[in-house]
């Protein structure tokens, strides 16, 4: 709760929640479920954008619990779902925004066919769920592929899909990924650490 309040006081207006079920991620990590997500929503209020990154095996059966918990956007792993088109349609019909995410070793073609229906594409720059990893710069080509496809889609009058990157983003590489064309960078330990306050870390990142 204190971290949430400090983040909001520092100017954070988008909160990214990682949901892991202990099965799909490589290190068997379990984080939290819909009840905690709902408590986050209630704590931060309606003006903070909240997304939910589902690193789970059964997103197609459980996503509605997270929509009902009040998230603005649900992001599901393309590698963990059987019928992306149906899932996208169902989430959208619920009134919740929808995104797809892909792992560093998954080709962009896995998501590109669904791009026109997505509010967001998330490119992982570390392996999901495995702590202590370094940023993987080799995802640059994938990020730029999505940037070009989204720009073309927008120029044709299509959906203004956001492009997000997640994994190992800190002050020293934030400007680099921005130059690749990402709209949103997920920052965890680069923001919340013992080295400085959240506000100080934000200031450092923005100054790069």
Task: Please tell me what each predicted stretch does.
Residues 19, 78, 102-104, 125-126, ...:
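Short secondary-structure boundary segments
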Residues 106-109:
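Alpha-helical scaffolding within the catalytic cores
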Residues 128-133:
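Active-site phosphate-binding strand-loop segment of PLP-dependent enzymes
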